[in-house]
Regions:
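One-carbon transfer enzymes
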Residues: 1-113
Length: 113
């Protein structure tokens, strides 16, 4: 039976977890954030996870709070730049978050920097 895994990540700290999960034999769908305009020239910049997916031929989707991943058996979130809404979590159960620091001492948006 195929298990459908979703990985939610958006920065360089996500990539080691994505690499490990991607090395398994099961299907994986990567969900990441859309490119943003940044810098003086307001150039469109893609995040490291999208870059990694493109260079390794891994299929990815852009995140939407309204999406329902009805075939998801398990979701893993690591260093993802979005906060899941309650509605999203209720529609898409079985999402686990990998927190990169000790809680509650090192909480916040950038606890390990």
């Amino acid at each position: 039976m195929t298990k459908y895994k979703y990985f939610f990540g958006s920065d360089f700290r996500s990539i080691p977890y994505l690499t490990t999960i991607n090395n398994s034999e099961e299907a994986i769908t990567v969900v990441t954030t859309k490119p943003v305009r940044s810098g003086r020239g307001k150039k469109l910049v893609i995040n490291p996870v999208e870059e990694f997916c493109k260079s390794n031929n891994i299929e990815f989707k852009y995140f939407s709070q309204d999406a329902v991943y009805s075939n998801m058996d398990i979701g893993i979130s690591a260093s993802f730049a979005k906060i899941f809404s309650t509605k999203f979590l209720k529609s898409n159960n079985s999402i686990f978050n990998i927190h990169l620091s000790l809680l509650p001492e090192l909480r916040g948006p950038s606890p390990v920097e």
